[in-house]
Amino acid sequence: MSNRKYFGTDGIRGRVGDAPITPDFVLKLGWAAGKVLARHGSRKIIIGKDTRISGYMLESALEAGLAAAGLSALFTGPMPTPAVAYLTRTFRAEAGIVISASHNPFYDNGIKFFSIDGTKLPDAVEEAIEAEMEKEISCVDSAELGKASRIVDAAGRYIEFCKATFPNELSLSELKIVVDCANGATYHIAPNVLRELGANVIAIGCEPNGVNINAEVGATDVRALQARVLAEKADLGIAFDGDGDRVIMVDHEGNKVDGDQIMYIIAREGLRQGQLRGGAVGTLMSNMGLELALKQLGIPFARAKVGDRYVLEKMQEKGWRIGAENSGHVILLDKTTTGDGIVAGLQVLAAMARNHMSLHDLCSGMKMFPQILVNVRYTAGSGDPLEHESVKAVTAEVETALGSRGRVLLRKSGTEPLIRVMVEGEDEAQVTEFAHRIADAVKAV
């Protein structure tokens, strides 16, 4: 990814109004993408977005660029990222485009692409789009210009798809669920899916106004969900992020259940049902407790680099069907082509219904190691803090102290100028002290 000018690990992302998330850039991006994708013969592109106010501006710019290249845009309106992947497949569109910055604040936005099969766009196609961006815009003949239309039943189509991943013989009629949609793209999808499957649903974070996406709600901040689950005496809570590709859950006692625990539940249930093929893929950030719990079940486990595209690559490399990040990206290739928060949540609910067990009890087979994550902001272009001798020295000291019962991981964020410092071990006070010691060394560089 290092030779890319625009595309990062998850498309193109930034603050709205600052390069590259500007109307003129996005218009040209639409044109360049159209020029590359038109070579493959199809003239349709699905465009979805989350609930950010800037989505209106950016979808208009994209549509203008695509039309100039001779491609037609099909708008879904606010729609979860995995829904765009699904609709791209079912419409046989040449590609899908999502306008979203996922879990970021409203003032950020981004553009990411799906290929015709609902997977992330291949590197070669992204590189071809970047090459096209260097050229001057040229417009096709007037008779060949693209058009724009709306998919009026997009939400209903995706709701039915989600429900179809839940076993027909099961129902959610015995469950009281608080669902938190982060004032994002799942606000009109997830509550309806759960209600139609029989659940008693209390919905929060379902009043988007363009600027409140991910604001103290959703998968990145479950405090409101935890409080509501306890207040309502609900069986559990489910939180999605702004674009619906992540899910985090909360049990009836208010405990957070992250992506590692969700994958453990789904993998164990797959094993019990005789449906698990191969092992499970986590990341360098996955908890040691997950690895040990899967090992006890005889389920192979592999770690990929952080990022859902790398999880998917490792899954494809090994021929495995389940992968996840602890942040809540869960990829179930027997059900979907990309991370899907609603579909992953439904598989956990199916395990609860089938086994008549609470979420708390389903998690009990996995002991989480204390894991402390500290984010340190640095000035982009000021050198690599991870290569500084003082940082290396402190990191080595901590690794020696932890021995084989802990881990240290330092990595750069793929989307922001942040160094993520993660320390994991058996003693929470110790790993907290170690994490802040390394973070202080990074700050001092």
Curated annotation (Swiss-Prot):
Activated by phosphorylation. The modification Phosphoserine is found at residue 102. Mg(2+) binds at residues 102, 241, 243, 245. GO terms for cellular component: cytosol. The active site is at 102 (phosphoserine intermediate). InterPro entries: A-D-PHexomutase_a/b/a-I, A-D-PHexomutase_a/b/a-I/II/III, A-D-PHexomutase_a/b/a-II, A-D-PHexomutase_a/b/a-III, A-D-PHexomutase_C, A-D-PHexomutase_C_sf, A-D-PHexomutase_CS, Alpha-D-phosphohexomutase_SF. Binds 1 Mg(2+) ion per subunit. Its EC number is 5.4.2.10. Its cofactor is Mg(2+). One of its GO terms (molecular function) is phosphoglucosamine mutase activity. Keywords: Isomerase, Magnesium, Metal-binding, Phosphoprotein. It catalyses: alpha-D-glucosamine 1-phosphate = D-glucosamine 6-phosphate. CDD domains: GlmM. Gene3D superfamilies: Alpha-D-Glucose-1,6-Bisphosphate, subunit A, domain 3, Alpha-D-phosphohexomutase, C-terminal domain. It is an enzyme of class 5 (isomerase). GO terms for biological process: carbohydrate metabolic process; peptidoglycan biosynthetic process; UDP-N-acetylglucosamine biosynthetic process. Catalyzes the conversion of glucosamine-6-phosphate to glucosamine-1-phosphate. PANTHER family: PHOSPHOGLUCOMUTASE (ALPHA-D-GLUCOSE-1,6-BISPHOSPHATE-DEPENDENT), PHOSPHOHEXOSE MUTASE. Belongs to the phosphohexose mutase family. This is Phosphoglucosamine mutase. It comes from Escherichia coli O157:H7.
